[in-house]
């Protein structure tokens, strides 16, 4: 079954975040340490509290956190993997900017530092209506292929092809996926 086009792929930005603190003995001198567990915890709670955007779907997820070296040691390093998504590239940008501010502020609040490494990104996409209709017509009439009744689907995923499609459409062309 041919699906002539799609829409609904969310724009996304993915980061690896490394928090740096200062190790100390949790029982002997906890005040000497700079606990990244506090920074990470503060960041996580506030990331999930980002106000959602009225212009469309928005998402945030903390996928993994790895931290600590022992139960009696103030953690001095943590790695967190996060992603934000938005129904449009603009909504994703809103989520990204909010997330970066939260992460940097959480680190600073607890006397830690952080570095953020961009691990991936994709823009939102929407197939060109006229091209979707043409693909549908060619598949049905010329190639005699079955065509899905629903021409598009919202799957909540993201697609790298969005960069190419958006560039083609910005130049006046048509694109479908």
Model-flagged regions — what are they?
Residues 1-127, 156:
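Midchain, well-structured core segments that form catalytic/ion-binding scaffolds
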Residues 53, 109, 141-142, 167, ...:
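Alpha-helix C-cap/termination motif
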Residues 83, 96, 100, 104, ...:
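Generic hydrophobic alpha-helical scaffold/packing signal
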Residues 112-116, 140-155:
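C-terminal helix-coil-helix/basic helical segment that borders enzyme active sites and/or dimer interfaces
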Residues 125-142:
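Short, low-order "capping/linker" segments at domain edges
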Residues 148-177:
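Zn-dependent metallopeptidase/amidohydrolase metal-coordination segment
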